[in-house]
C-alpha cells in the first residue's frame, strides 16, 4: 500500500497562499515607497532601526546579524554600503579588537527620521488603516505565536529583543 503525501487541506492552502502573497506584496510596496522617497532599501532601513533602538545607536556587527537572522557577510556588506553613504560608521570594540560595532552617524539619524516618516505612512496605508483594532490584535497574537515556533530560543521575548545590549556605554561611544 502506498502512502499519500501529506497535503494541506483546502482551507489551509487558502490561508497559506493569502498570507504569503499579502506579506510579499507588503514587502514590495514598502520597499518601493522607501526607495522612491528616500532612496533607501528596506533592508538598510531595518538595520538603521535596529541601531536606533540601542541607547547609543551602536551594536556589534554580530548582534545585528543575530537580530536580523542574516549571515554576517551580508551584514558586513550592508554596513559597508551604509558607511559609504555616511549614515553609519564602523568602530572597533575596545575590549575585543576582533569585534566591530556599527554606529549611527548624525547623517544616519537624519536619514532614519525621513525614512521612518515614509515607513509609518506606508504601514498605516497598507496595514493599520485597513485593519480594525481587533484585527490588529489578532495579527499581533498570530505573529507572536509563529515567531515563538520559528525562533524558540527567544520565545516570548521578540518585542524586547531590540533593547538587549552586548556592550558597555563606553564601547559604543568610543
Stretches with model-predicted labels:
Residues 24, 49-54, 116, 144:
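Short, locally clustered residues in the helix-turn-helix/winged-helix DNA-binding domain
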Residues 1-10, 133-174:
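C-terminal regulatory/oligomerization modules of transcriptional regulators
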Residues 2-4, 80-138:
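Charged, amphipathic alpha-helical coiled-coil/dimerization segments
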Residues 11, 15, 43-45, 107, ...:
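N-terminal positioning helix adjacent to the helix-turn-helix/winged-helix DNA-binding module
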Residues 1-38, 85, 167-174:
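N-terminal leader segment of winged-helix/HTH proteins
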Residues 61, 79-80:
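Short, hydrophobic-biased segments on the C-terminal half of alpha helices
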Amino acid at each position: 500500500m502506498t502512502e499519500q503525501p501529506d497535503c494541506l487541506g483546502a482551507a489551509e492552502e487558502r490561508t497559506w497562499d493569502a498570507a504569503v502573497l499579502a506579506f510579499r506584496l507588503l514587502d514590495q510596496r514598502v520597499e518601493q515607497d522607501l526607495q522612491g522617497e528616500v532612496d533607501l532599501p528596506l533592508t538598510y532601513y531595518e538595520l538603521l532601526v535596529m541601531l536606533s533602538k540601542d541607547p547609543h545607536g551602536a551594536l556589534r556587527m554580530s548582534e545585528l546579524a543575530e537580530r536580523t537572522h542574516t549571515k554576517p557577510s551580508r551584514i558586513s556588506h550592508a554596513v559597508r554600503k551604509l558607511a559609504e553613504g555616511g549614515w553609519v560608521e564602523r568602530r572597533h570594540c575596545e575590549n575585543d579588537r576582533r569585534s566591530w560595532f556599527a554606529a549611527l552617524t548624525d547623517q544616519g539619524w537624519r536619514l532614519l527620521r525621513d525614512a521612518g516618516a515614509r515607513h509609518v505612512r506606508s504601514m498605516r496605508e497598507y496595514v493599520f488603516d485597513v485593519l480594525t483594532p481587533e484585527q490588529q490584535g489578532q495579527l499581533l497574537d498570530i505573529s507572536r505565536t509563529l515567531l515563538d515556533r520559528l525562533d524558540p530560543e527567544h520565545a516570548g521575548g521578540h518585542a524586547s529583543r531590540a533593547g538587549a545590549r552586548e556592550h558597555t556605554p563606553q564601547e559604543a561611544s568610543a
